Amino acid sequence: MFLKFCLWTMFFFSAWSPIGHAKYSSLLEVVTPLRVTVTRGNNISPGWLSYSLNIGGQRHIITMKPKKNLISRNFLLFTYSDQGDLLEQHHFVQNDCYYHGYVDEDLESPVIVNTCFGSLQGTLEINGTSYEIMPKSSTSTFEHLVYKMDSGDSESSPMRCGLSEEETAQQTKLQESNAPTLLQIPYENWWTHHRFIEYFVVLDHKQYVHRNNNITTCIQDMLQIVNGVNGYYLQIDTDVVLTTLEVWNEKNYINVELSIFKVLGDFCTWKQNMFGNRIRHDIIHLLVRQGYGLYLGLAYLADVCTPYNCGVSSVLSDVMSDMAHIVAHEMGHNFGMKHDGIGCTCGLKDCLMAPYKTNSPKFSNCSYEEMYSVVTKRSCLYDIPEALVTNLTVCGNKVVEEGEQCDCGNSESCLQDPCCSSDCVLKPGAQCAFGLCCKNCQFLKAGTVCRKEKNECDLPEWCNGTSAECPGDVYKADGIPCSGEGYCYKMECHQRDEQCRKIFGNGSRSADEICYMEMNRQGDRFGNCGNDSSTYRTCQIADVLCGQIQCENVIQLPQRRNHETVHYTHFSNITCWTMDYHFGITIDDIGAVSDGTAYAPDHICVDRKCVSKSVLVSNCSPQLYHMQGICNNKQHCHCGVTWKPPDCQKRGHGGSIDSGPPPLPLSHSKWIVYILIVLDVCIVIIIYLFSFYKLSK
């Protein structure tokens, strides 16, 4: 019990108020970055980029160079098979499109952007004000949107650590006495040593689903986050290198819906049981798409390079700069940085390690001093991640690794396995050991459905007959009509009637338009078009059907969660029912009209606004598939049952280049049966006639 108590006291409650969760106070303007030539003296600096931007009526030049050491050369990606087997990959990742720089030759004004998709996306700071830049959709002139990032009154609800200074000192003493890797560095030289953080990240299942079940998108997200984190850690001469990423693509392997304090402990225990010291890492973080009330993150204090080098971050925002700030703050705790208090300064109003969420990019003098007390005693921080090695490839650990066909575990388990032998190769006659297209150690025949469509906006996938893996999950492209007047959006056919039924049960339906007009123009918790963390936004008339869902014909109130409140109001003999949404709640607002819900002909709701369906940019058009199919979410043609991909121009059996080959149409099978029957009849007749001829002769 004492040991358990000690372990629990070895963390720092890095709890933040969600006040200041990254948002945009207003659209500053539309800008068109102009590429300019960079010179240093008389020579053009290789790899550097410069763009001219006109922001707020002033011309600024941002100068950037590629960020090196963003991802290790031997980057490891872990995913899971549908049967729960851990799969290891050495994944190639594009990492030459991430940049760091500055504005107008001011080295104190950071620029953190990426150009991976041919445009600028990231953050920059001008005269102490932070801005987010992102590409404008549907533009052919390289237009970008520039927003001012506003954190509001971030001190209005500060959350601070509950540990006393004496308890913190005891923890630090205990950590140092148990530290396995110590390296004393003379004080005068410590800052000249460049440090590397080998960063291991785990993404939970909700985040994977939120990113459309796309592993590549998850990797791209993490690179943007790590690029942002590196922008903060440049000032302390530290490279944060993404060495390992695990995606819980099948399910969560711990319960992330408990308190954040329990989740942190469970995650660290899971990490030690799952990997131990087999995967080298200095810090490991779990990023979850889960709200924890007022808390955005939690991490153990000063435990970098120890078995308790863990942290948890709630990533409910899709703004990568916001997520990077949360991760950087939690990583600071792993480095030994406490929350800033009186006397801590960085030249700005707030610093990065403030107890509440800010947009500050700078560490305080206190953070520097606290970090020094840790980094001088951690030799692991001076290892170069490019030399990363892993000894995880061990036959018999039930993990299918590179070079293995299967892994059935110990000898006893392998005796019961019909497909896999104890030396991690397939048994004679076996084609496979796992996978949605594997049955009885054999590949399922081509055309066997391995993933049925979940709903009318989904698409099926079929086995190809030569692989145990089912093709990746694809679905109908956003904007395709569904259920009469609806449109498919992110694999769902969003409709107000259906949303009302999900909230209030069968029989309920979307209310009369007067409910939307009266309620959503009030701008309160029961009727609004979103909020700015301090005030609710009143819906414009054109957007009222995209605000809070308003329902009628509610027969029986279903049991809701504790933080949810049902509200009803009468207008013109109509009872309008809706759900409220409180400030400080970090889960999705279930009472908001779902993105993708149809508004009017060729219009949908997106982010509480009525927008043209044309915002759903697609490179796939009816002309591309010759009017004989539909587009999928990868912008490829999914052909009808009698047409052949990729362009549905020739006769075939349907499907797409992403779905696998569909089965032979039943009509074709019937024709084959008919032909065989006719042939059999003909053979019988010929034999009969031949026999009759011989007898008559």
UniProtKB/Swiss-Prot annotation:
This is Disintegrin and metalloproteinase domain-containing protein 26A. PROSITE patterns: ADAM_MEPRO (PS50215), DISINTEGRIN_1 (PS00427), DISINTEGRIN_2 (PS50214), ZINC_PROTEASE (PS00142). Sperm surface membrane protein that may be involved in spermatogenesis and fertilization. Residues 392-478 form the Disintegrin domain. Residues 188-671 are extracellular. Glycans are attached at N127, N214, N365, N391, N464, N506, N531, N573. Residues 1-22 form the signal peptide. It comes from the Eukaryota. Keywords: Developmental protein, Differentiation, Disulfide bond, EGF-like domain, Glycoprotein, Hydrolase, Membrane, Metal-binding, Metalloprotease, Protease, Signal, Spermatogenesis, Transmembrane, Transmembrane helix, Zinc, Zymogen. Residues 693-697 are cytoplasmic. The chain crosses the membrane at residues 672-692. Residues 616-649 form the EGF-like domain. The active site is at E330. It is a single-pass type I membrane protein. The gene is Adam26a. Disulfide bonds join C305-C380, C344-C366, C346-C351, C450-C470, C620-C631, C639-C648. Zn(2+) binds at C161, H329, H333, H339. Residues 195-385 form the Peptidase M12B domain. InterPro entries: ADAM_Cys-rich, Disintegrin_CS, Disintegrin_dom, Disintegrin_dom_sf, MetalloPept_cat_dom_sf, Peptidase_M12B, Peptidase_M12B_N, Reprolysin_adamalysin. It is found in: Membrane. It holds the Pfam family ADAM_CR. Its cofactor is Zn(2+). Binds 1 zinc ion per subunit. Its EC number is 3.4.24.-.
